[in-house]
C-alpha cells in the first residue's frame, strides 16, 4: 500500500513541480510581467489584450500605434522605441530556448524515474510523445515570436499532466511486479543509482538554466529602463506601461524542481 501511495504522490509532485517551473518564470522571476499577449517578428512588436486600455500597441522602426492610431513622437522617443523593438527581437529567442530546456529537464526526469522503477527503457520512451508535443507547441508559439500567456500555460500543463498520468501507470505496474516477484531489491538499486546520477546531471543543468534566466532578467530590465525614459504619454496623460512591476521579484523557480521531486519520490518507493 505504501508503494502504491508513493506512485500516486510521485505523479502529483511531478505534475505540480513541472507546471510551476514552466516558461512563465522568465518574467515573474525578474519582478516584471506584461498584461499583453505579444507577437515579435520582422514587421514589429504587436501587443494586444482583451481587458484594459490601450488594447493594442504596435512598435516598428521608431513608430508607435496605439489602438490603431499613429502617435506623434520626439526623435529621442523614436530612437528609444527602435531600441525596445531590437531588444524584444533579441529577447524572444532566448525565452524560447529557456522554455525548451525546462521541457527537457522535466521529461528527462520523468523518463529517468520510469526506467529506474520498471527497468525498461522502452517504457520510458513511451512518454517521449508528450515531450514532442510540448516542444512542438513551443515551436508554434515562442519559436515564432508569439507569447500568449494563458493558452501557453494551459497547453504546457496539459502536456505535463498527460505524461505524469502515463508515468504513474507504468510505475504502478513496475512496483507491483517487483513486489510480487521478490525483486524489490533490484528496484532499490536502480533508484539509488538513478538518484545519484540525476542529482549530478540536473544540478549542473539547473545552474546553467538559472544563469540564463538571470541574464534574461538583465535584458528585461533594459527594456523597462527604455520604457521609463519615454517622454510620450497616452491620451489623458498616463505613461505607456507595457511592462509592469511587481512589489518584488518572485522567488526563482528551481529549474530542476521536477527532477528532485521525482527522484525523492522514486527513492521512497524502494524502501
Annotated model-derived regions:
Residues 6-15:
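Bacterial N-terminal signal peptides
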Residues 122-218:
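Extended amphipathic alpha-helical interaction segments
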Residues 87, 91-94, 98-101, 105, ...:
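Structured segments of extracytoplasmic/periplasmic soluble domains
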Residues 20-130:
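N-terminal Sec/ER secretory leader and immediately downstream segment
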Residues 1-5:
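Positively charged n-region of N-terminal signal peptides that target proteins for export
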Residues 192-271:
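A cross-kingdom marker for long, charged
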Amino acid at each position: 500500500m505504501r508503494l502504491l501511495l508513493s506512485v500516486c504522490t510521485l505523479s502529483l509532485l511531478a505534475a505540480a513541480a513541472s507546471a510551476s517551473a514552466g516558461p512563465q518564470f522568465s518574467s515573474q522571476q525578474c519582478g516584471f510581467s506584461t498584461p499583453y499577449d505579444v507577437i515579435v517578428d520582422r514587421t514589429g512588436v504587436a501587443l494586444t489584450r482583451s481587458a484594459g486600455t490601450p488594447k493594442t500597441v504596435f512598435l516598428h522602426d521608431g513608430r508607435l500605434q496605439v489602438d490603431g492610431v499613429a502617435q506623434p513622437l520626439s526623435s529621442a522617443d523614436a530612437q528609444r522605441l527602435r531600441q525596445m523593438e531590437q531588444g524584444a527581437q533579441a529577447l524572444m529567442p532566448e525565452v524560447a530556448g529557456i522554455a525548451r530546456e525546462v521541457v527537457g529537464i522535466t521529461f528527462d526526469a520523468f523518463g529517468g524515474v520510469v526506467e529506474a522503477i520498471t527497468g525498461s527503457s522502452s517504457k520510458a520512451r513511451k512518454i517521449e510523445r508528450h515531450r514532442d508535443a510540448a516542444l512542438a507547441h513551443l515551436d508554434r508559439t515562442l519559436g515564432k515570436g508569439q507569447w500568449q500567456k494563458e493558452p501557453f500555460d494551459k497547453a504546457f500543463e496539459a502536456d505535463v499532466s498527460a505524461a505524469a498520468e502515463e508515468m504513474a501507470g507504468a510505475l504502478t505496474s513496475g512496483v507491483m511486479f517487483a513486489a510480487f516477484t521478490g525483486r524489490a531489491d533490484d528496484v532499490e538499486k536502480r533508484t539509488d543509482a538513478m538518484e545519484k546520477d540525476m542529482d549530478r546531471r540536473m544540478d549542473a543543468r539547473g545552474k546553467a538554466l538559472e544563469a540564463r534566466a538571470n541574464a534574461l532578467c538583465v535584458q528585461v530590465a533594459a527594456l523597462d529602463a527604455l520604457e521609463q525614459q519615454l517622454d510620450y504619454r497616452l491620451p489623458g496623460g498616463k505613461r505607456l506601461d507595457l511592462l509592469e512591476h511587481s512589489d518584488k521579484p518572485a522567488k526563482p523557480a528551481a529549474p530542476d524542481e521536477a527532477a528532485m521531486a521525482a527522484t525523492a519520490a522514486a527513492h521512497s518507493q524502494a524502501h
